[in-house]
Structures are given as C-alpha cells and as structure tokens.
Curated annotation (Swiss-Prot):
Record-stated family: Belongs to the SNF2/RAD54 helicase family. RapA subfamily.
Species of origin: Shewanella sediminis (strain HAW-EB3)
Protein name as annotated: RNA polymerase-associated protein RapA
Subunit structure and binding partners: Interacts with the RNAP. Has a higher affinity for the core RNAP than for the holoenzyme. Its ATPase activity is stimulated by binding to RNAP.
Amino-acid positions noted as binding ATP in the UniProt annotation, renumbered to this chain: 176-183
BP GO terms, sorted: regulation of DNA-templated transcription
Known function: Transcription regulator that activates transcription by stimulating RNA polymerase (RNAP) recycling in case of stress conditions such as supercoiled DNA or high salt concentrations. Probably acts by releasing the RNAP, when it is trapped or immobilized on tightly supercoiled DNA. Does not activate transcription on linear DNA. Probably not involved in DNA repair.
Keywords carried by this UniProt record: Activator, ATP-binding, DNA-binding, Helicase, Hydrolase, Nucleotide-binding, Transcription, Transcription regulation
Domain Helicase ATP-binding: 163-332
Motif DEAH box, residue numbers: 278-281
Helicase C-terminal domain segment(s): 491-641
Origin organism lineage: Bacteria, Pseudomonadati, Pseudomonadota, Gammaproteobacteria, Alteromonadales
Pfam families on file: Helicase_C (PF00271), RapA_C (PF12137), SNF2-rel_dom (PF00176), Tudor_1_RapA (PF18339), Tudor_RapA (PF18337)
One GO MF term attached to the UniProt entry: helicase activity
EC number: 3.6.4.-
C-alpha cells in the first residue's frame, strides 16, 4: 500500500477509533495516530487492515472545525487529497485538505462503508438478512409469547394464555382445580404481555412462603428476572428512589409487606400495568367487614389496569367470597351479591344448550328452542339447518356448532372473567390408588386422652376435635419429653417398615404440624438411618429449596420428604408417586391440596395414597367420611367444601364421640347429598365454563401449531449460524444438547445473557422439560433475541462483495442487491408490530436498473455466489462507482413503491381486524355486561394512533451486496 504522511485511513477492525492519520513511516511499518481516541497503532505496510478514506463528488466531507463541504472536485497533490466544493456555512467555494478532516468520522451508512472500503465477509451479509427475517417472523406471529417458555404444550394452559394474554389490561380469575397449572397459565400471560408491550411493570403478590418459588419459576420457565421485595429491600432501595417499587420493573412481594400503610401507599403510586395475586382464596370478604388482605388488593385493583387472581378453590371460603373476588375484577359488573345469585340461576339453561351443541348429536327440539331464545338478537336458523342436515360435511357441521357455542360463551355468564378447568374435562391425569392401614391405639394415648378429657372440658368443639385427631399432641402436653411419642406410636413403626420395603421409591409424607414433621424426621434418622429431609413453615425459603432439591436428587438424595401442612403449600413433587398422609386435615380442600402435590399434570405414574390411622378413633371416622362419603381419596371432590359446611355439625359430633350408629347415618346422608351435588354440577354452569376454559378443538390446533414451530429446522440452522458468526464456542454434549461458551475471538466484547462459564442449551422441548439445567432455545429466548440485536444494531454484514460464476452472463456484469428496512417509530404498547413490524425489503438490480427480485429469490441467488478477499472487493467497488450511484437512486424508488404497498396493506389489515373486534364487542355489550367500556375505548384510540404511526413509516437502507459476474 502507498502510504504518505498526513493521509487519512480508517481501521477495518477497530472502526470505533475514528479517522487515523499517518504520522510515521519506518521500514516496513507505518504508524497511525487516531486523534478522536488519542491512541496510536503500528501496522505492517504490506498487509494492514486499513482502508484509505477518499470522498467522491456529491459527498459531504466534514472539517475538524465543525463545518462541512459538499464535494464537487477531488484533487490529489503529493499523495494527499484536497477537496473543493461549497462551504456549508458561507455557501461559497472552499477547499479542505484531508489532514483537516473531522477525526470522529465513522462510516455507519452502508453506502458510506462500501465506498470507504469497509467490506464484510460474504456470509455476514446473509446472516444479517436472516436475522432481519427472523425478527420480522417473530413480530408477525400470532403465537408471540407462547413458544418461548419452558413448559409442556398442554392445550388448556396454552388456550387460556392465548385468550387472556392478547387482551389489553386483562382482568380475570384463574381458578383451575389443583394440579392443572395455574402458575404456568399466569406465567404465559405475563410473558405474552411483556413481549407484546401490553405491559412493562408487573407486581406479583404471593404468600410469603411462595416468594422464592415464584422467583425461580419465572426465571427457569419464562426467562423473566423478577426481584423479590421485602422490608429490607425497600429500605436499601431508598438510595436510588424515594419509592422503592420504582427501582425494578418486575416485582414479587408478599401480602404481609403491603399490609404496612407506607408500603401500600408506595405500591399504589408505582404505575403498575399488571398485578397478579396468587392464593386469592385467602382474600375473605363480607359486605360489612372485608378483611385487611382484601382491602389491600382492592385498593391496588382500583389503580392497576390488569389484574390476574389465582385460586384453585373459588368457593373454598364460601360463595360470597367467590363473588367478592369477581368484584375485584369488575366492581361495576359485580355490584350486588343477590343480583349475582339471581343471574347464576339462569346458567342451567345456557349449560344445557351448550351441552347439546358439544355432544355432536342432532339437536332435540327443546335445545333448538332454548338456543333460539338465548341468541334472540341473531338469526341462527342457517346454522341450525347445517347441524341438523344429514348430507353435509361433518367438518362444516362442527364449524356451525363451534360458532353457536362461541356465541353462547360470549353472551352469557362470566366467561370472559373466569376460567376454571376441572380434571373431568382435562385428560392426562394418573389413577389414584387408596390404601388404609389400621393401627391399634397405644395405651399411652388412651390414658392421655382420658386425662385430657377431664382437664380440658372448657375447650370448644374445634379444640376438642383437634385433640381427638392428634392424640400425640395430647400426650406431649403431659410428657416432659415431647418427642418420646414416636417411640410407641404404631404409625411410626408402620412408616419405618414401609420405607424399608420401598427403598427405591421417593415418598412424600405430609403431617398437619411442623412439630410432628420434625419428630418424624428424628425418628426415621435415629431408629433406622433413613435418608429424609423436612419441609415446614419455620424454615427459610432457601432452606426449603435445598430440602426440595435434596429430595429430588435421583442418586444420593433423600428417600422421603416430610412436610407440614403450610410448608408444602404451592410446592409440587410429581417426580414422586408415593404419598403418605400421617394424619388428615379437617377440610376436604386441604386434603385435595395435599394429594395435588403429586397428582397433577406431568405425573407419569399412578399415585398411591397411604393412610395409617388409629383404630376406633376420630382418625378412623374422618378417614371413613372422606373415603365413603366424598370418595375424596380416589377422585377429586369439587363439592367437598359444600358438603363440609352442610355436615360440619354431625361430623364434628362423630369425631368427638366416635359413635358407630351416628357415623353410619352420617355416611349415608353424605353419600346421598354427594350424588345430588354431582348431578347438579354436571348440569349446571360448570359445563359451559369448562367448554370456554379448555378451548376444545381450537386449543388442540393451537398446540399443534406450537409443536410445528418446535420442529422448524430452518430456525435451528439460522440460530447456529448466528452463533458461528458472533464467535460463540459450540460443543455437542449428547444428542440434542449444545454447550455454549464465550470465546476470546467473539465479534463483540460481551454477549448479554451468555454466562461467562457457559450454558447448556437444546432445541428439544422434551429434553428441556426433563432437565432443569438445560435451557430451551426458541426464537423468543433472550439469548437468541440478544444475538439478533447484536447483529442488526451493529454494522455487521451491511456491506459485501461477491462473484457470480456464470458463463451464460457476460463477464463483468454487475448486480446490486439492496436490503431496506421498512419501519415506523411507535411505542411497543401501540401493537403496531402486529400490522407492520420492521420489514426487510429486498431489491435486486441489474446494471440497467431493472428490479429482478421477484424473479430471482435470495436463496437461489445466494447459492451461486463466491467470496472475494477484501482488497479485491475494494478495488471492484472503486471501479464500479460511476455505475453504482445512479443504481442506489433507482433502488430507493423501487423500495418506496414497496413501502407504500406495505403501509396500505398494514392499514387495511389493522382497520379490518380492529373494526371487526370493535363491532363484535359493541354487539356483545348489549347482551353481556362483562364487556368493559375501557376495552371499547382502547380499540378506538388504538385505531387513531396506528393510523398516525403508519403515516410516518420510513425506509432505511440496511445492507448492500455488490455482485460481479466472472468466468474465471
């Protein structure tokens, strides 16, 4: 390379240094000073990664004094360049020597980089274009937010998330039965709301015992980094903000923290977009005396636009409390309890009509009459005729059924605010096997009970029942050695023998009290050395996590985990299938929660439930009532709370007095009432609610679409090429898994999201679900999104030169491939990306300015190209400049035409979709008060905003590839 003092060059490998000046020439070396960064670099004259900066007529050259020159003539004198042209400030003729050019010049625009000789490798152009296509594909996906989470593709969960997550400020109650995955549904909704920009600030309120579990679950399953707030964290945050809640976007805290007046006031003032409340059945309410917890959540629900309430037992604390939770979601709609009860009484007709539609059979006359009356504002005769016909395609008939079902669901009941799936409507659950083990009552307990009855006559009914169910507690009250009870309790002997006989099986043991759990751990450890661990409310969150992990270890882990009632709430251990109930809770819903720790979706084995009990005691009576009265061990019992409230008095009497005749009578009455309630529930509102909640065939199709995305080999290839170009080390570690590590040769100094010690990843959902230590890679994963951002926000791949070896074309023929990005600046929350996301526009020009892109695809063209080295590429560009300048202008004309087509198409799509949705909701509002005014107004405002953003849509040249035909 011919170097001279004072010449200006730019580094191809360190463009951030700015413009360099040749300051020394010694032998075979050249020294450049970079004034912008005050650094020097020494290069070999023969192979320096440098490009001479020479502007062309028409370019703007900037002086180090701040003014610029529109170049009209380029003069070379003594190997230095002098530019002549028009002064930007005076408008007069002026000259500018290259030594006086602005030191901070950087060539960011693709055409500037091309003419400055900053030319990228051929494959980088392709990777950049693929990155832009991937970003566009994700933004336009109607499944955005559902594919990325590390969760199983379970239809009802995905359906609820799909329906709720797409709404503006959703306000719903998620009330699936235990084990159906409400936390996953909530996480999917949160993930969707964040990815689509519908929400940015999210507050999750959970019981204190579940804070860390939510933190881990959100990170491990959804790649969402929440922060746990307690009083200490709030105090620390004062250093950054007067309101601690403003220091993070995603916050998890306990209800206890918000009971404090100051913290509640700060939370109310924190501009949340979405609030999630777990275990919402703890929010007790009466019209005259709402609980403090309820009032806290109510205050927040009045200022936070979106609200998700999670509860497995919507009626656990009574129907009135269920109404109160609906009231939190929409106080205007659920304003009066009596009116709510009256409306519920009409659900039976709706459910019967829905059942007839869902049956797949011809509709009886009474069902047709009922449907006609319920949907009186619409002529449904054509749909009825299709359903009743005998010569019509079954798929067409099913479409007609689905349409009428949707009309029913939209217009009646709480379908838009309440989702509740039951095990009866969701497949995939194991069989429950119940085993009872009678044990003789120890004489020590008999004596303690007799003494206790004399001394504790003042106890109320609840106190007496509690003592009757836990004789070990009575004994401990009279024995100085409170732990000695396990030395003679036959249930402990049975437990030890069971564990010894089933050494290879993981066993979950649940007892009501933490003290009992600790005593059992001591007994198993000291008497037989059985590896166990405990889990109770007195332990810290980290201690519980360690205990859970120790139990989960297949090799060297604990055989048994002993939990207290409260300590196990919200924790799931479906890798185990043996459940021992050392005692029984006095509440059918708590019993179901215990069994639900193992009996849930994801359980691959039958769940065996073992109940050791003391004969002829309250324990046996309660076990009999649960088993023979409610069938609660072998089946879920949705009516358990109703039966318990109805039979509480005779049940408590039987537990205290243990009268056989009274027990027999109680069991008979309970069985009769159980069957009645089961029949009522089959016929009532629940059927319609479940049809809406599990999604039916639509949910199955949704899951099929997601599964097809998982099998997209094109995505896998694109992501691996992306990591190759960035310089990420990739090492296969078994079938379907890759270890990613940062390398010293990465294109970028840091790769956010890629740990320094590496990460193991897979594209296989099943593997990711079976291995917590392996990340599931989809297009939505942060490590992929970050990689796409690194490429598209940098200059990587913006310029390229290639050779096309094709003897059918004249040698020296030029093609210019231009990639433009059509984009409109708009806040993410506007949802503009649904209609016009950043869109790559490809233009392929021949030397005459003809656009060949419709006839020559990118893939077919790219396969024929070969790379050239950078020095030759730079010479080819310089030799082609006179041809290229008019081609750029021509390319922009073609791109502008494409931009208008894109904008018009986006406007038509937006207007059609939102107008249709607005008209649908306006029609529904006339017959279903669940439609909120805010939803309608939001759509109207959104249409106006989007039209404005589309008017401002712009083009930007993103990448250039110059191609020359060669016969060599």
């Amino acid at each position: 390379m011919p170097f001279s003092l004072g010449q200006r060059w730019i580094s191809d490998t360190e463009s951030e240094l700015g413009l360099g000046t040749v300051v020394a020439l010694e032998g075979r070396m050249v020294t450049l000073m970079f004034p912008a960064t005050d650094e020097n670099r020494l290069f070999s004259r023969t192979d320096a990664p440098l490009t001479r900066v020479i502007f062309n007529p028409g370019d703007k050259a900037e002086s180090h004094e701040g003014w610029s020159l529109t170049v009209s003539e380029v003069e070379e004198k003594d190997n230095l360049i002098i530019y002549h042209g028009i002064h930007s400030e005076t408008g007069e003729q002026a000259s500018l020597r290259e030594t006086l050019l602005n030191h901070n010049i950087r060539f960011n625009k693709p055409q500037d980089r091309l003419f400055a000789g900053q030319i990228d490798r051929l494959e980088r152009f392709g990777v950049r274009y693929q990155c832009q296509l991937l970003r566009h594909k994700l933004a336009t996906s109607d499944l955005l937010g559902l594919q990325g989470p590390r969760v199983g593709l379970i239809p009802h969960q995905q359906w609820i998330a799909h329906e709720v997550g797409r709404r503006f400020a959703p306000r719903v109650l998620l009330a699936d039965e235990v084990g159906l995955g409400k936390t996953i549904e909530a996480g999917l909704i949160i993930h969707q709301q964040l990815l689509t920009g519908r929400a940015e600030r999210i507050l999750v309120i959970v019981p204190d015992t579940l804070r860390h579990q939510w933190l881990v679950e959100m990170l491990r399953r959804f790649n969402l980094k929440f922060s746990v707030f307690d009083e200490d964290r709030c105090i620390e945050a004062y250093a950054d903000n007067d309101n601690p809640f403003y220091t993070e976007q995603l916050v998890i805290c306990s209800l206890e923290l918000l009971r404090k007046k100051k913290r509640l006031e700060q939370a109310l003032d924190a501009d949340w977009d979405l609030m999630v409340v777990d275990e919402a059945h703890h929010l007790e309410w009466t019209e005259d005396a709402p609980s403090r917890a309820y009032r806290v959540v109510e205050a927040l629900s009045e200022v936070v636009p979106g609200v998700l309430l999670l509860t497995a037992t919507p009626d656990q604390l009574g129907h009135q409390s269920h109404f109160a939770r609906l009231r939190l979601l929409d106080p205007d709609r659920f304003y009066d309890y009596e009116a709510f009860l009256k409306e519920e009484s009409s659900y039976k007709d709706v459910a019967s009509a829905a059942d007839a539609l869902a049956s797949g059979n011809k509709l009886p006359d009474d069902a047709i009459n009922s449907l006609t009356e319920l949907l009186s504002e619409k002529d449904i005769t054509p749909s009825i005729n299709v359903i009743q016909a005998t010569d019509i395609d079954p798929d067409q008939q099913q479409d007609a059924r689905d349409e009428l079902l949707q009309e029913l669901l939209d217009r009646h009941g709480t379908g838009r605010v309440l989702y509740r799936n039951s095990r009866a409507s969701v497949k995939g659950f194991p069989t429950r096997i119940f085993n009872a083990y009678p044990q003789a009552m120890p004489s020590q307990y008999v004596t303690a009970a007799r003494v206790g009855a004399m001394m504790n006559g003042h106890l109320d009914t609840q106190g007496k029942v509690k003592q009757a169910l836990s004789p070990e507690k009575i004994y401990q009250d009279f024995d100085s050695n409170s732990a000695s009870w396990w030395k003679f309790d036959p249930r402990v002997d049975w437990l030890i023998n069971f564990l010894k006989e089933n050494r290879r099986k993981k066993v979950l043991i649940i007892a009501s009290q933490a003290e009992t759990a600790l005593s059992l751990e001591e007994a198993l450890r000291t008497r037989e050395g059985i590896q166990t661990t405990v889990f109770h409310e007195g332990m810290s969150i980290i201690e519980r996590d360690k205990a859970g992990a120790y139990f989960a270890q297949e090799t060297g882990g604990a055989q048994a985990l002993i939990c207290s009632e409260i300590g196990s709430e919200g924790r799931n251990f479906q890798f185990a299938s043996q459940l021992i109930l050392f005692d029984l809770p006095l509440n059918p819903d708590l019993l179901e929660q215990r069994i639900g720790r193992l009996d849930r979706i994801g359980q691959n084995n039958d769940v065996e439930i073992h109940v050791p009990y003391l004969e002829k005691t309250a324990q046996e009576c309660l076990m009999q009532w649960y088993h023979k009265g409610l069938n609660a061990f072998e089946q879920t019992c949705p009516s358990g709370h109703i039966l318990f409230s109805e039979f509480a008095e005779p049940l408590l009497d039987v537990l205290i007095n243990q009268n056989d005749d009274s027990l027999t009578e109680l069991l008979n009455h309970t069985q009769t009432r159980y069957k009645e309630l089961k029949t009522v529930m089959e016929q009532g509102r629940d059927k319609l609610l479940e049809i809406n909640s599990h999604g039916g065939e639509r949910a199955n199709k949704l899951v099929q679409s997601l599964a097809a995305r998982d099998e997209d080999t094109q995505l896998i290839g694109s992501v691996i090429r992306l990591w190759d170009v960035i310089g990420v080390e990739q090492e296969d570690c078994g079938e379907n898994a890759i270890v990613l590590n940062p390398s010293e040769h990465m294109m970028f100094p840091t790769y956010p999201g890629l740990p320094e010690d590496g990460i193991t990843v897979t594209f296989d959902r099943e593997m990711a679900l079976s291995r917590d230590d392996i990340a599931l890679i989809t297009q939505e994963h942060p490590i992929v999104q970050t990689g796409l951002d690194l490429i598209t926000s940098s200059e990587t791949g913006t310029t390229s030169v290639a050779v096309l070896k094709n003897k059918a074309l004249p040698a020296g023929t030029i093609f210019l491939e231009l990639i433009y990005m059509a984009d409109a600046s708009a806040p993410k929350s506007s949802q503009l990306y649904r209609y016009l996301p950043p869109t790559p526009v490809r233009i392929l020009l021949d030397k005459n300015g003809n656009n060949l892109s419709d006839n020559v695809t990118y893939e077919s063209f790219n396969k024929q190209l070969s790379a050239v080295n950078r020095h030759i590429a730079s010479k080819l560009v310089n030799a082609s400049q006179t041809i290229l300048h008019p081609l750029f202008a021509k390319g922009e004309e073609f791109a502008e035409v494409e931009l208008k087509l894109l904008a018009d198409s986006a406007r038509a799509k937006m207007t059609s979709q939102l107008t249709l949705e607005l008209e649908r909701l306006e029609a529904l509002k006339a017959v279903n008060p669940n439609i909120r005014d805010e939803e309608l107004e939001h759509i109207r405002e959104q249409m106006n905003e989007l039209n404005g953003y589309l008017d401002g849509c712009l083009l930007q040249l993103d990448a250039i590839r110059l191609v020359l035909v060669s016969h060599a």
